[in-house]
């Protein structure tokens, strides 16, 4: 019996353990952190051996194959030992893909992944298809394949997941954009990060489709290096030669594989970045064969994604917007670009090698104040203090919201769009967004 070791017992690891057990492997799960009770119960229910708080080296190095949590960097000591030994290391998505013939619609990109993935799932589910949501959002793909298999899966993929995928094939692959992000995990080399994102196209055949943003200079440059067999489906904000998705004369238009159009005003998602997300999602659904009436309805009634330009409300005349998912500079740029009132920008957190020069002009144009929120705000001071905009330095969400109240005037917008990861002060970006919303709503009480 082959031995599979799973490192990390979160959503993906616990799900992979269940599928591996079902497929007859000897399974051992190891997590250096504390495992959540629900995942312990799931593994106990399937008689899966697990450990937490440490790694038993002998058991792990005895594996025939290792499934690694995407959160574990390749520099981790145990990963280095496994690599030196030549043990295959794969992702949960790669493993799950071996045990299903379902159609895979896969989405990656530095920004817009969650919105686009959620929109595609919303439309396909509305059409009555048997579809699952997996990857960075939804339930573990492996667990769904093991216990509630579907005919279609819509999967959000990070670069970390793609790093350990080799044989997996996306029937519809979407690459929204490539901008600097997570460079701390890629030796601060943009090409390493780009190579990871381009892995979404691997193993595609003539029967498959690759949807990408035609105006992304990095993507178009990379395409020249790849001899892709899949059908290329570029989209753009405006009509360009070769593009099969675009906006023209106030209409949202697709012309592959069938012609579809609807008034742009009917689209539920607003902002330039959401034009791209909606075009990519519409093309994917059109390729899958969603009827045009359902496609129009889905693009019109999609409610949006939590923590992504989420309107929290208007309190004491000030609008509050939660964009906690903006964990890189490019995401913050799109958020600022969509602002129509004087903005108090909340920025800061765990810096991932950010270049703030990309947003300085927009900050000068849009912002009436800046509130720094992080354990160490020195880099923010170095970049923004000289702009002549009022700034405040804070180290907790409570102090941050209080500073925003001090700076904001009626009619202004307070925008939490941090450019950074959240792990310096918060559990995750969701925790950061929830704390922000709770404190803001308390203003109105």
Where are these regions (language model features)?
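N-terminal leader/targeting and accessory segments in enzymes
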Residues: 1-91, 95, 382, 392
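Phosphate-binding loop of NTP-binding sites
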Residues: 2, 21-22, 58-61, 70-214, ...
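Nucleotide phosphate-binding/pyrophosphate-handling subdomain across enzymes
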Residues: 3, 15-23, 130, 262-368
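Residue-level detector of alpha-helix initiation sites
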Residues: 11, 73, 111-115, 275, ...
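Residue-level signal for inorganic ion chemistry
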Residues: 20, 66, 107, 136, ...
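Short internal beta-strands
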Residues: 26-32, 210-214, 346-347, 366-375
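C-terminal helical cap/extension that packs against the catalytic core
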Residues: 39-41, 357-412
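Beta-strand->loop->alpha-helix junctions that form or flank phosphate-binding loops
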Residues: 51-54, 90-94, 227-247, 296-300, ...
């Amino acid at each position: 019996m082959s031995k599979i070791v799973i490192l990390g017992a979160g959503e993906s690891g616990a799900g992979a353990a269940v599928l591996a057990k079902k497929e007859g492997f000897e399974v051992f799960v190891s997590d250096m952190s504390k495992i959540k009770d629900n995942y312990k119960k799931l593994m106990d229910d399937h008689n899966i051996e697990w450990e937490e708080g440490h790694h038993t080296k002998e058991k792990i190095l005895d594996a025939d194959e290792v499934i690694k949590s995407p959160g574990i960097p390749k520099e981790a000591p145990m990963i280095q030992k496994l690599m030196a030994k030549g043990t295959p290391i794969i992702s949960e998505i790669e493993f799950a893909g071996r045990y299903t013939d379902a159609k895979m619609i896969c989405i990656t990109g530095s920004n817009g992944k969650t919105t686009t993935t959620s929109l595609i799932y919303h439309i396909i589910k509305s059409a009555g298809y048997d579809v699952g949501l997996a990857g960075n959002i939804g339930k573990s793909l492996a667990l769904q394949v093991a216990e509630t298999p579907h005919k279609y899966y819509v999967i959000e993929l990070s670069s970390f997941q793609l790093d350990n995928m080799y044989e997996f094939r996306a029937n519809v692959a979407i690459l929204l954009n490539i901008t600097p992000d997570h460079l701390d995990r890629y030796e601060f080399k943009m090409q390493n990060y780009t190579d990871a994102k381009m892995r979404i196209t691997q193993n595609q055949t003539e029967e498959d489709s690759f949807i990408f943003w035609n105006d992304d200079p990095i993507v178009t440059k990379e395409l020249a290096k790849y001899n892709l067999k899949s059908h290329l489906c570029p989209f753009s904000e405006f009509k360009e030669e070769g593009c099969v998705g675009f906006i023209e004369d106030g209409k949202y238009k697709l012309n592959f594989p069938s012609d579809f159009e609807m008034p742009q005003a009917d689209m539920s998602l607003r902002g330039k970045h959401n034009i791209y997300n909606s075009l990519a999602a519409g093309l994917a659904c059109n390729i899958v064969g969603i009827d045009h009436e359902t496609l129009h309805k889905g693009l019109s009634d999609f409610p949006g994604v939590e923590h992504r330009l989420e309107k929290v409300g208007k309190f004491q005349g000030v609008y509050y917007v939660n964009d906690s998912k903006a964990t890189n500079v490019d995401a913050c740029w799109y958020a600022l670009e969509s602002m129509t009132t004087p903005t108090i920008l909340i920025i800061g957190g765990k810096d991932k090698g950010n270049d703030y020069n990309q947003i300085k002009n927009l900050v000068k144009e849009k912002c009436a104040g800046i509130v720094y929120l992080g354990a160490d705000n020195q880099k923010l001071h170095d970049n923004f203090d000289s702009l002549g905009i009022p700034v405040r330095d804070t180290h907790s969400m409570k102090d941050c919201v209080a500073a925003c109240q001090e700076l904001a005037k009626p009619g202004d917008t307070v925008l939490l769009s941090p450019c950074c990861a959240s792990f310096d002060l918060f559990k995750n970006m969701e925790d950061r967004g929830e704390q922000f919303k709770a404190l803001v709503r308390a203003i109105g009480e």
